Amino acid sequence: MARYLGPKLKLSRREGTDLFLKSGVRAIDTKCKIDNAPGVHGARRGRLSEYGVQLREKQKVRRMYGVLEKQFRNYYKDAARLKGNTGENLLQLLEGRLDNVVYRMGFGATRAESRQLVSHKSILVNGKVVNVPSFKVAANDVVSIREKAKQQSRIKAALEVAEQREKPTWIEVDAGKMEGTFKRLPERSDLSADINEHLIVELYSK
């Protein structure tokens, strides 16, 4: 499946919630009618079936983290094999992706931009270049901007925006050095309450 390259706001309107696909700290519902579906007339959404609700939640989370369908299913399979709550395991696996960690640290304005920074070899993990967005970051790994990339205006702009956002407690960032430490995996209480991972588990359990 190809990666979606169309308007980002359209995806958020389709899911009925801010997927944080656009840069900035202003809530997306101040920019567009989030309650209305995409399209000229922006028709209100009809009542979904149980399956439809589960599918929408899966699509919402998949798009939020910028993961393709096959990748997302594989993350679910890995989460199901781990001890503990499968839904929480799934979110932790997604949060541990390098592109997501780069975004959480504020080096990229969006996850898509952070993915690009990784792919363009602008990111170091423990001093070594890693250009795989799905690379699994471990506790106490140090993620930093490569020296020759530190003057990129988009990175500086992203850090300025990140200063206005709530800082994740599981990550420590030195904006001056453009480096951060992934202290631990986030607890469920650290993450968005707008995500209902139980619906995703129910969908894949059928």
From Swiss-Prot:
Residues 96-158 form the S4 RNA-binding domain. Transmembrane segments: none annotated. It comes from the Bacteria. One of its GO terms (molecular function) is rRNA binding. GO terms for cellular component: small ribosomal subunit. The keyword Isomerase does not apply. The keyword DNA damage does not apply. GO terms for biological process: ribosomal small subunit biogenesis; translation. Keywords: Ribonucleoprotein, Ribosomal protein, RNA-binding, rRNA-binding. PROSITE patterns: RIBOSOMAL_S4, S4. SMART domains: Ribosomal_S4 (SM01390), S4 (SM00363). Gene3D superfamilies: Ribosomal Protein S4 Delta 41, Chain A, domain 1, RNA-binding S4 domain. Belongs to the universal ribosomal protein uS4 family. One of the primary rRNA binding proteins, it binds directly to 16S rRNA where it nucleates assembly of the body of the 30S subunit. Part of the 30S ribosomal subunit. Contacts protein S5. The interaction surface between S4 and S5 is involved in control of translational fidelity. This is Small ribosomal subunit protein uS4.
